[in-house]
Amino acid sequence: MIFLMALVLMYGDFLFADFSPFDAGRLTIYTVPKMLLMFILLMSVYINRSISSFFAIVFGILIDIYSGLVYGVHTFGMVAFVFFMHTAFRVFYKDFVAMAFVVLTLTFLYDAYIYTIYRILGLVTLPIFDYIALRGLPSLILNALLFIIVFIITLQTSKVRKNLLPKH
């Protein structure tokens, strides 16, 4: 069930790519949803850090293969951000607003991490201010809207998993 949901969210991320970029006047705005990343981060809280790390590796590899630019960037990034989430959540345990803030901040930082790596390698030429104004913040707003949906999916998935586990 978890794997299937992660596949659906990854497909949703790729599907949103068809709608981005869009033009607003003379500006081209990019929105990059990170539903899969938010799901994996929330899994580290509501399901298990080990399972979340496993999914980060598997789906990081799939995204690396799909993008085909630099192998390992997404895999390493997802695993690292799962550990950041696990560390941060110890501080903000059971506080929804703080958890949402941490997940959205880590999602923004993950996107900035990908941008930085690609920028260093010369694969992206977008200046930093343009990145923040035309991609970073619009993506953050989109991900904030999608967070509620991903949060509900994560809660439902964790309940299904707990119901399927044998009771001792």
Specify the residue positions occupied by each region the protein language model found.
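Terminal, non-globular segments
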Residues: M1-H168
